[in-house]
Design a protein with these regions (language model features):
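Thiamine diphosphate
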Residues: 1-101, 105, 109
Length: 109
């Protein structure tokens, strides 16, 4: 078996993209993101590669949407999970800063 070289961010995106639920469907359907200092270089690039299916071992693209507000992204991810009867979910990421705490507040739902 050949060695696959990935950065930590690429490995995380690849890992998220292959998680399956009990029905055999993709569990993490995509990612909401606000890019800024702290996550634009590593994670942003890995999500871009995942969006276009350019990461080794990915069989289908990993969608990424750019959000405008951290709390809204978290609420959207929660609504998606509830609409799918919690059989599927969305990942959410933002840069480090005051907006990141808004995701924690939204997660209290």
């Amino acid at each position: 078996m050949a060695t696959i070289r990935l950065t930590a961010a690429q490995a995380m995106v690849r890992w998220l993209s292959v998680q399956m639920n009990a029905e055999g469907e993709r569990f993490i359907e995509g990612c909401w993101a606000i890019f800024g200092h702290g996550n634009v270089a590593g994670l942003g690039e890995a999500l871009q590669q995942g969006l276009h299916g350019q990461l080794a071992g990915m069989n289908k693209p990993f969608p990424t949407w750019r959000g405008q507000n951290e709390q809204t992204m978290a609420h959207t991810a929660i609504a998606f999970a509830k609409a799918r009867a919690r059989r599927q979910a969305m990942a959410v990421t933002s840069s480090i800063g005051p907006g990141a705490t808004n995701m924690v507040t939204a997660a209290a739902l």
